[in-house]
Regions:
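Catalytic cores of peptidoglycan-degrading enzymes
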Residues: 19-164
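Non-catalytic extracellular/periplasmic "stalk"
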Residues: 1-26, 30
Length: 164
């Protein structure tokens, strides 16, 4: 039983997006309401932007299965990874992608390179975390990763809880 629980904890740790997707880069534009740089109107920014040079590696924030690898009008070259438990990460504006739909990826695996494709003002990674299809603040997951895996799992569980 103890061995089974340890295995479950290890799986959860690797499947919750707590790994920094661009190493050594601080987040620029944060999650939340801001003035859209294209329209000049207030709009919800559904992710976290990491400014980096074109070609900088983009890493999977957690293990999972690639459910989308496409060119999107707004996101440009984009990858989405399903981590189970209705938890998905999105990586947008890539110059190149190295995975395809159906690929199994591990935490920290290089999946793409930073670019400025789609609706972008310069080279960066736009990183999103979606729980049950609803955008969440990725910073909460990344901070939880710095605090420890158990906390990351708690953040994912709390984000998935039904709202009243």
């Amino acid at each position: 039983v103890v061995e089974s629980r340890l295995f479950d904890q290890r799986i959860r740790k690797n499947m919750v997006p707590t790994q920094e997707p661009v190493l050594g880069k601080t987040a620029g534009s944060a999650f939340g309401w801001r003035i859209d740089p294209f329209t000049g109107q207030s709009a919800l920014h559904t992710g976290l932007d990491f400014q980096a040079d074109t070609g900088t590696p983009i890493l999977a924030a957690a293990g999972g299965v690639v459910v989308a690898q496409e060119v999107h009008p707004a996101y440009g070259n984009m990858v989405e990874i399903d981590h189970g438990n209705q938890l998905v990460t999105r990586y947008a504006h890539a110059s190149r992608t190295f995975v395809k739909r159906g690929d199994l990826v591990r935490r920290g695996q290089k999946i793409a390179e930073v670019g400025t494709t789609g609706r972008s003002t310069g080279p960066h990674l736009h990183f999103e975390v979606l729980v049950q299809g609803v955008p969440q603040d990725p910073q909460k997951f990344l901070h939880a990763g710095a605090a420890g895996a158990a906390t990351g799992t708690q953040v994912a569980t709390k984000a998935a809880a039904p709202r009243r």
